[in-house]
Amino acid sequence: MYLVYLYRMKYWLSIFFVLLGCLLFSCIREEVSAGHDRVEPGDMLPDFSVVLNDGSELSTQSLKGKVAVLIFFHTECPDCQKELPVIQQLYEEYAANEEVAIYAISREEGEEEVADYWERNALTIPYSAQDDRRVYELFSTSGIPRVYVCRRDGTIVSMYSDNPIATYSQLSEDVENTLNFSSYLFAEQMLSLNLPTRIY
């Protein structure tokens, strides 16, 4: 009798785990298939506004005229933990350049958690802690980190996700190319107006 009981338990447990596996697989497939970017290279930055950790405002409008790098993150995300030091290195490289703006925006993570992580990891990137996905979902539906590089006019020129995450050399090259492209457009505009040209 006991052996019959064990056999039945094994049978039903097998069915349970098979069904559980199917359920998990379908959830993963749904997440992957549903996960896409709402904005892509060539699109304009969506209209958003957030408060930074120093109390100042960051918005689409405030980024106009600057080459911008934005990262969406969560401090418990392993890929974000790898990407944030890269963004920190980039931030330190361009901190003195007023033409470049680099910011981090959390996805569903509050001020206390983000501030604690920043302090423990010696990060100085300006950030905005967002308790929800309201701002994040203007850019994407799933997946972090998300890194966007934008021109002075708000056009997104490159986007990186977690597969693979962006490297410092890639981001630095993107920023330099975008700075040079913006300067080229500025020169073209000045020439078309027959005004003295100054390359920034």
Regions found by a protein language model. Give the residues of each.
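Thiol-based oxidoreductase modules, predominantly thioredoxin-like and allied folds used
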Residues: 98-112, 123-132
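Conserved redox-active cysteine motifs that mediate thiol-disulfide chemistry
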Residues: 72-89
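C-terminal motif of bacterial Sec signal peptides marking the signal peptidase cleavage site
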Residues: 23-26
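Short, internal strand/loop/helix patches
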Residues: 115-153
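Thiol-/selenol-based redox modules, centered on thioredoxin-like
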Residues: 149-200
